Amino acid sequence: MNLSSLPFRLLAAAVALCAIAAPASAERIKDLAQVGGVRGNALVGYGLVVGLDGSGDRTSQAPFTVQSLKNLLGELGVNVPANVNPQLKNVAAVAIHAELPPFAKPGQPIDITVSSIANAVSLRGGSLLMAPLKGADGQVYAMAQGNLVVGGFGAQGKDGSRVSVNVPSVGRIPNGATVERALPDVFAGTGEITLNLHQNDFTTVSRMVAAIDSSFGAGTARAVDGVTVAVRSPTDPGARIGLLSRLENVELSPGDAPAKVVVNARTGTVVIGQLVRVMPAAIAHGSLTVTISENTNVSQPGAFSGGRTAVTQQSTITATSEGSRMFKFEGGTTLDQIVRAVNEVGAAPGDLVAILEALKQAGALTAELEVI
């Protein structure tokens, strides 16, 4: 790994986020929240992929593949003797998963993903035999079958040598499953619609209630908690859909995101929120020293000028490392200035991560620090 390029990645990530985290503008409710109960549901199943060109499971190491094939053949009226274990290379046991979209009706197709369970080299060219897809309640909601589309490529020699491009053991089947059972209607029998924010924020909830009341009349919406807004609605499904169509396009300005720093300790990437500030502090990390100081200046207007006395903060950041020159920064004490100071002296990403953690423990970093 070229460590000399890492400081520039740190700085680029910090500057990029500061550019992204601009003051919040008006956004639609449909971009900030989802309607309660309107969501997808996970489906999972097990099946067999056949027709592989010698790239299937090594059945001596995956006996369940043979057992599954015997069971399938038995259901089709073909009896395989119990003491016979066919050694096949064109069959693979697979897991199937999909998402049942909201309001899906019987007969509608959905996409599925097929993944090898055992030691198949590649699923390219294979066909999935009919397999049921079940929900968390154990009920069958869809039936899957079709020809796989595999983006990767894999091959294996007799001596065990192997070459692969991308991931050939996973494929997709567009419209590969047919919905057989519909989910219960979430719109039936209630006089309220609930809107759940994607992120918990009391300010956004308050502003959403105000925006809805302004558009539909006072008392239409009420805040339930930091995530949920309840909206009065008619019980007729058609009228509720019309209300939602108008409701999801109401615009409001969401609250500011909380001050947060996200650090990836493995790659050295640091993402800094716009509102992150650092209190005065001095840090010594090995041969690296970072000093933060803050001075208070008072601006006194002239007599009879009508002006007001103003207090301004002037911050100074310096970073030194053994054998390196000193760097000095003027202005507000923001975290991206510390990142710049640390990068200028050529510190490794691990140094910056350790400094951020120490600042948080000392109470000098007034933001949430998340290490991923």
UniProtKB/Swiss-Prot annotation:
<dbReference type="GO" id="GO:0030288">
    <property type="term" value="C:outer membrane-bounded periplasmic space"/>
</dbReference>
<keyword id="KW-0574">Periplasm</keyword>
<dbReference type="GO" id="GO:0009428">
    <property type="term" value="C:bacterial-type flagellum basal body, distal rod, P ring"/>
</dbReference>
<dbReference type="GO" id="GO:0071973">
    <property type="term" value="P:bacterial-type flagellum-dependent cell motility"/>
</dbReference>
<feature type="signal peptide">
    <location>
        <begin position="1"/>
        <end position="26"/>
    </location>
</feature>
<comment type="similarity">
    <text>Belongs to the FlgI family.</text>
</comment>
<dbReference type="Pfam" id="PF02119">
    <property type="entry name" value="FlgI"/>
</dbReference>
<comment type="subunit">
    <text>The basal body constitutes a major portion of the flagellar organelle and consists of four rings (L,P,S, and M) mounted on a central rod.</text>
</comment>
<dbReference type="InterPro" id="IPR001782">
    <property type="entry name" value="Flag_FlgI"/>
</dbReference>
<protein>
    <recommendedName>
        <fullName>Flagellar P-ring protein</fullName>
    </recommendedName>
</protein>
<comment type="function">
    <text>Assembles around the rod to form the L-ring and probably protects the motor/basal body from shearing forces during rotation.</text>
</comment>
<keyword id="KW-0732">Signal</keyword>
<keyword id="KW-0975">Bacterial flagellum</keyword>
<dbReference type="GO" id="GO:0005198">
    <property type="term" value="F:structural molecule activity"/>
</dbReference>
